[in-house]
Amino acid sequence: MAWRSGLCETDSRTLKQFLQEECMWKLVGKSRKHREYRAVACRSTIFSPEDDGSCILCQLLLFYRDGEWILCLCCNGRYQGHYGVGHVHRRRRRICHLPTLYQLSFGGPLGPASIDFLPSFSQVTSSMTCDGITPDVIYEVCMLVPQDEAKRILVKGHGAMDLTCQKAVTLGGAGAWLLPRPEGYTLFFYILCYDLFTSCGNRCDIPSMTRLMAAATACGQAGCSFCTDHEGHVDPTGNYVGCTPDMGRCLCYVPCGPMTQSLIHNEEPATFFCESDDAKYLCAVGSKTAAQVTLGDGLDYHIGVKDSEGRWLPVKTDVWDLVKVEEPVSRMIVCSCPVLKNLVH
């Protein structure tokens, strides 16, 4: 008996986009004739199978038959269908401290296919043995941003720009941006200098400016939406199936309070922003402004510190490095968080 599966043109485009752009694939089985991959994705705005809840467990069988590649897809235990495509490119991604992952791309639209069997997938196992994207991973893969490159990344303002300039997307809180490029995502963000990170004691959180400003202003009250994890993160390595607490490693954090003036509740992380004992507020907006602001402009154009009277105080600059993280780690960070993913997809 032949099993047929098809989908409309719109569904074909969105499914292809989801599988290519929102999933990092782990090889879980193979034989001479097939490969089986697994991915765990956070909730998606373009692809939502039934009962997806807050995350989507994707299982994919891939094999070649009669001149085309056949994809058999199962999501959250429900078989979605099988589809044909002319070409499949599998890109192996080896990342320090992480298991090998794959990115899949499909040459042409996903079309209807016919198979003579009902696909069977491997049993799903879930493990917390992999720590995901840790500070060690970030410091290993990040690169300092040269000043000439930083000047070409516009983060505020519009109007006439140099043809070499590119506009980045601001990610929620302070000091983090994403630049979508044809070759993939590039994340730009401020992070504590490595020497300071190794001496500060906390080796679990990624000490981004975004995270530390949120920690400094967190009120800690039960039910505060700014201080509570949104519970939508997933493990980008696919080892753990389900939603996980973020553990201070995402760039989705925002200050607890108005972006223009958030009260400092926790002194220890606040010391990374200002030397003065008079510091009362942290601001996710700069004490200086201009019609156009680039990453090459000073830190005073991106953040600020105020005293109790609302006067601007000097911002610490020597403790921060402006770094960039590129594919595939940038995509893993974005696609493990529904907040970040919705900003750029």
UniProtKB/Swiss-Prot annotation:
InterPro entries attached to this UniProt entry: Herpes_UL16/UL94
Region (Nuclear localization signal 2): 90-94
Region Nuclear export signal, annotated ranges: 55-63
Subcellular location: Virion tegument; Host cytoplasm; Host nucleus
Pfam hit, one: Herpes_UL16
The UniProt record lists the keyword Cell division: no
Protein's UniProt keywords contain DNA-binding: no
GO biological process, one term: symbiont-mediated suppression of host innate immune response
Keywords assigned by UniProt, alphabetized: Host cytoplasm, Host nucleus, Host-virus interaction, Inhibition of host innate immune response by virus, Late protein, Viral immunoevasion, Virion, Virion tegument
GO cellular component, one term: host cell viral assembly compartment
Stretches for region Nuclear localization signal 1: 26-35
Known role: Plays a critical role in cytoplasmic virus egress. Participates in the final step of tegumentation and envelope acquisition within the host cytoplasm by directly interacting with the capsid. Upon virion binding to target cell, a signaling cascade is triggered to disrupt the interaction with the capsid, thereby preparing capsid uncoating. Additionally, antagonizes the viral DNA-triggered antiviral immune response by targeting host STING1 and preventing its dimerization and trafficking.
Family, similarity comment: Belongs to the herpesviridae cytoplasmic envelopment protein 2 family.
Subunit details: Interacts with cytoplasmic envelopment protein 3 and with the capsid. Interacts with host STING1; this interaction prevents viral DNA-triggered antiviral immune response.
The name this protein goes by in its record: Cytoplasmic envelopment protein 2
Organism phylogeny: Viruses, Duplodnaviria, Heunggongvirae, Peploviricota, Herviviricetes
Gene that encodes it: UL94
